[in-house]
């Protein structure tokens, strides 16, 4: 078992996304994908991973996500926090607070963190055999030396 946790950073948009998986089980998720999804597909293939779920930490008003393209290319489901239920034009997997996502030797836990947007979630990354988290993927909830702002809620109605 080996945890895969790879960050992709697009400096011009200050956008971080992640490939998280377990090399033994071959199961993986992508969190907050960039518009160009080829890097996730290429890396997953080279690492022997199958992307099963695309997680959006929140609705992104500041860039175009690649979630639909990545789901189409892989057959992955698209997951959002529970407050997103009924707000998309496509099917989503509702990721409720406390839910655990098992990837084999790695697991993820969903934390609802409304504030930046009502459906914002953070993802806590665990590795089997280690009780403490390896990482917390915070979307736009936390920034280095700052916190996320309540974001453009008027765009939701």
Where are the model-predicted features located?
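Short hydrophobic/aromatic beta-strand element in the GNAT-like acyltransferase core
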Residues: 17
């Amino acid at each position: 078992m080996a945890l895969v946790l790879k960050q992709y950073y697009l400096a011009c948009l200050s956008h971080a996304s992640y490939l998280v998986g377990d090399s033994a089980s071959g199961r993986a998720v992508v969190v907050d994908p960039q518009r160009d999804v080829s890097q996730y597909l290429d890396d997953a293939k080279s690492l022997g991973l199958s992307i099963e779920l695309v997680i959006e930490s929140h609705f992104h008003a500041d860039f175009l996500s690649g979630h639909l393209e990545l789901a189409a290319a892989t057959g992955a489901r698209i997951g959002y926090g529970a407050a997103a239920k009924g707000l998309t034009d496509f099917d989503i997997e509702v990721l409720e607070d406390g839910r655990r996502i098992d990837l084999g030797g790695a697991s993820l836990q969903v934390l609802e963190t409304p504030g930046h947007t009502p459906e914002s979630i953070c993802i806590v990354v665990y590795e089997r055999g280690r009780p403490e988290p390896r990482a917390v993927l915070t979307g736009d909830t936390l920034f280095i030396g700052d916190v996320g702002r309540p974001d453009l809620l008027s765009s939701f109605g």
